[in-house]
Amino acid sequence: MAQLIDFQKVRRRMWRKRLHNLLFLAGFAAIVFGVSFLVYHNGNMDLRTAVNTVTAEFASGSGYPVVLPGGRLLGMSYMDNGLIITADSNLYTYNNTGRRMLDVQHGMINPTISVAGSRFLAYDRGGTKVMLFSRSNQLRQVSTDFAIYDGDMARNGNFALASRSDRHLSQVIAYNGDGNIICRYLFSRRPAVCVSLADSKDAMTVGLLDAQNGDFLSVISRYQFPIENPTASIELPGELILHLNYQDGSNIRAITDQRVILFNSDMKETASFSYGEQQLIRFQYGQDGKLALYLRDATGERKGRAVVLNDHLEALCSVPQNADPNGMALENGILYLSQSGEILLYNFTGKQTGHYAINGLGLIQPMGDTLYYTTGSELCTITSKEIMDRTSQRGSSKNASESSSTASQRRGSSEESESASSSSRRSSSSDAESSKMEQSASDRWEMVKDALLGSESEAASQDGEKTEKTSSSQPEASSASEASSISESDPESEVKE
């Protein structure tokens, strides 16, 4: 007898089998995608380190503020989805929920940070110690035999160190992400004081310093690994090279004591921004490539201006200041300045959009719309919108208070006028007395108003005097003909006077 076939059951069985195969392929694709994401997101880290890094990044903390560990804070830097705090003894990293991802003793006297994406290089300027980190792990440690002048790290994992040498005046050694030497460049006539790596290719620029006719002579050279000789060079007579920034494959920015210069890959100057008669005190790179400068007037006072430059070194804004800022940062079209315990916000038209006073204000570092700041014992956050809203509310309250005081004064004056008018109908002597009272009330209002304005001006002048006294305790700026040094905590640097 023929067996009947239930085609409905056959179809269901085939559909389940097909679904099983699709789920298996989807799971396999997810694993491949996850591994690819880890490799791309964390460069040439091993898989275990990459997994730990991503896990630490997304692990939840208790939020901000967080209590900072002991030690003197030296600097604060941003990295991809993380914050780096440099103390005199330890390095710390935090994610955006306040979770501490890294806590390690660095053992350096002058720790300096160079950030590249989700990793950063820590080296002892003037010392010999070098350490590489992810957000949550120490990747490796490299020891050099000679004092380090400068260092830089690229997103592709390469890093370079400019240092002294035994048989030559200086050297620059380029390493890959595993800490193996790619190239070694020796310089017998000039010390290499600056180095910057390209993120997307095996190339770097080196700044060399020399003297000519009693003045500085800076030389900038571009190198392509593993070619021994420079592919292009340029001399800058009379200028002191302070910092190099290899933006991408075709643009190189050089900061000297006199100007900021933009070069192409052939080291041909394409743009320049001069400081004029002012002196460079501080500079800061933004995450979008813009550059902020603080320039002090040559009058001997602590007055100056903060300038924001775009990628073509065109000035977007110039903000006058009556005192040197303690900190400066750029993010999302906002210039942040910290000064005398207050955070000042400016847009790129130069208009002040907010200000916020904070007791014990220390370091500042914006990431996105959030500003991270320290207060001595805590790491805190506030958004730029919150600062602007609070500024607006204070302004509205002040205007309302002034309007109320003015209305009250007008009512008082009106009542006194009516009283004076009534008294004048009684006697001429009373009229004279009423006039005296009205004039006295008016004078009192003017006196109170002047006192209020005067107290604000006096407070501002006292703040200025305090700032001036604090600043005057530091040595005055050296002239352009004298050797200067750079103290850099990447991405923010400050010229030591």
Predicted regions and their residues:
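N-terminal Lys/Arg-rich, disordered targeting/topogenic segments
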Residues: 1-20
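Structural motif
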Residues: 128-131, 167-173, 213-222, 260-263, ...
